[in-house]
C-alpha cells in the first residue's frame, strides 16, 4: 500500500521484478494474481487507456519516437490542451534540462538522441494532469547536468504534494529523495519502509555480491566474489 502524495522509490538487483511491477500497475503487462487498487477502485482488469484516464502516467526506460509529430504537439496531447501555449511547452522542457527554444518545434524522430527523447517524455508526463506518476529509471541516458535538473524537478513535485510519485531507480541521489523505499528481490518485496529504515539494510539483503546503488555514475563496486 502506498499513501497518497508520497514519493516512493523501488530499487533492488537486476531481474528482481521492478519494471514488471511498474508495468503491471500501468496495465502494460497482466497481473498474474491479486488485485491492483487505485483510490479504492479495482483497476486490475482495466485497459491502459482507462488507467490513464484515472490519472496514472508512465515513463518508459526506452520511450517511443513519433515521426511527423512535433515536440510541442506531443506536449499538447499529453496535457489534454490542444491550445497549450509555446511558453507553457517551453516551461515543461526547461524543467527537464532542455533548451526549450531548440526543441519545441523539432520532430520526435531519429534525429533526437535517446537521452533527448527520454527527457521529452518526462516533460510530457509533467504536462499531463496525473495522480500517480510512474518513472522507470528516469536517469537512463541522461547527462550529469540534466540529471541535476531532473532531481530538482522531483524535489519540486514532492514539495507540492499533489502527486504520488513512483520511481524505479538505482541512483542514490534519487532514492534519497523518497519518503519510502521498496526493495524488490526475486519478485518479492524484501523491504518496505522509510529510507532511514531501509538504506542500512540494502547491501545486506542483496548478499553483498554487487551494490546496485549508483552514487553518481554507472559504476558498480565489485565484491571479492567478482
Q: What feature does the model see in each segment?
A:
Residues 11-13:
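The feature captures the beta-strand-to-loop junction immediately N-terminal to the Walker
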Residues 26:
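Helix-to-loop junction immediately C-terminal to a conserved catalytic motif
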Residues 34-41, 54, 88:
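Conserved ABC transporter NBD signature motif
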Residues 42-57, 202:
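ABC ATPase NBD coupling module
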Residues 62, 68-85:
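Q-loop/switch helix immediately C-terminal to the Walker
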Residues 125-126:
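ABC ATPase C-loop
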Residues 137-138:
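Walker B catalytic motif
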Residues 188-213:
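Conserved beta-strand-loop-alpha-helix hinge in the C-terminal portion
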Amino acid at each position: 500500500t502506498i499513501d497518497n502524495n508520497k514519493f516512493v522509490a523501488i530499487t533492488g538487483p537486476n531481474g528482481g521484478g521492478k519494471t514488471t511491477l511498474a508495468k503491471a500497475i500501468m496495465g502494460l503487462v497482466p497481473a498474474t494474481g491479486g488485485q491492483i487498487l487505485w483510490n479504492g477502485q479495482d483497476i486490475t482488469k482495466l485497459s491502459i487507456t482507462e488507467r490513464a484516464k484515472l490519472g496514472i502516467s508512465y515513463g518508459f526506460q526506452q520511450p517511443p519516437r513519433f515521426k511527423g509529430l512535433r515536440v510541442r504537439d506531443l506536449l499538447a496531447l499529453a496535457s489534454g490542451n490542444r491550445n497549450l501555449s509555446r511558453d507553457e511547452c517551453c516551461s515543461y522542457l526547461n524543467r527537464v534540462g532542455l533548451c526549450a527554444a531548440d526543441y519545441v518545434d523539432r520532430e520526435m524522430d531519429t534525429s533526437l538522441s535517446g537521452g533527448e527523447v527520454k527527457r521529452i517524455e518526462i516533460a510530457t508526463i509533467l504536462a499531463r494532469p496525473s495522480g500517480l506518476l510512474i518513472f522507470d529509471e528516469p536517469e537512463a541516458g541522461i547527462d550529469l547536468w540534466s540529471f541535476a535538473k531532473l532531481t530538482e524537478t522531483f524535489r519540486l513535485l514532492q514539495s507540492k504534494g499533489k502527486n504520488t510519485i513512483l520511481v524505479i531507480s538505482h541512483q542514490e541521489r534519487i532514492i534519497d529523495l523518497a519518503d519510502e523505499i521498496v526493495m524488490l528481490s526475486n519478485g518479492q518485496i524484501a523491504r518496505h519502509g522509510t529510507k532511514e529504515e531501509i538504506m542500512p539494510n540494502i547491501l545486506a539483503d542483496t548478499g553483498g555480491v554487487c551494490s546496485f546503488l549508483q552514487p553518481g555514475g554507472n559504476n558498480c563496486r565489485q565484491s571479492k566474489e567478482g
